[in-house]
Design a protein with these regions (language model features):
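Conserved phosphate-coupling serine/threonine residues in phosphotransfer and NTP-handling enzymes
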Residues: 18
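Asp-based, Mg2+/Mn2+-dependent phosphohydrolase catalytic module
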Residues: 21-22, 26-108
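Generic beta-sheet signal
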Residues: 14-15, 71
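Short, acidic loop-to-helix structural element flanking the phosphoryl-transfer center
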Residues: 1-14, 54, 97
Length: 108
């Protein structure tokens, strides 16, 4: 997974959108080098919002200075993907690396 994320990061700007807290984020940054691939972080504990709240995704779009149709949101929770899709973001449910690669071909 880390190598695929790094490959994506070499061609696209990547942001991490996570329902997390400061403790888990610090652990991830210390233990998973893939975290360095992301240019921006949208973290629930900093935003005081949680996915799948549509306001969460509006906040992300504002932070990215991006329109929904120019973004792809990938998550393993269908309700989060549905919420992002409802405001126009290309949403993909993560099930496996192979399926994700195939799904990304249709939106990138």
């Amino acid at each position: 997974m880390a190598s695929f994320v790094a490959e994506l990061g070499s061609e696209h700007s990547l942001a991490l959108a996570s329902n997390t807290d400061a403790i888990h984020l610090a652990f991830a940054r210390e233990n998973f080098s893939v975290m360095g691939t992301f240019q921006q972080f949208f973290l629930s504990y900093e935003m005081a919002l949680l996915k799948p709240d549509p306001a969460y995704f509006h906040h992300v779009l504002y932070g990215l200075w991006a329109s929904p149709e120019n973004c792809v949101f990938i998550d393993d929770r269908p309700e989060n993907v549905r919420s992002a899709s409802n405001i126009g973001i290309n949403g993909l449910v993560f099930e496996s690396i192979g399926k994700l690669k195939s799904d990304l071909e249709s939106v990138l």
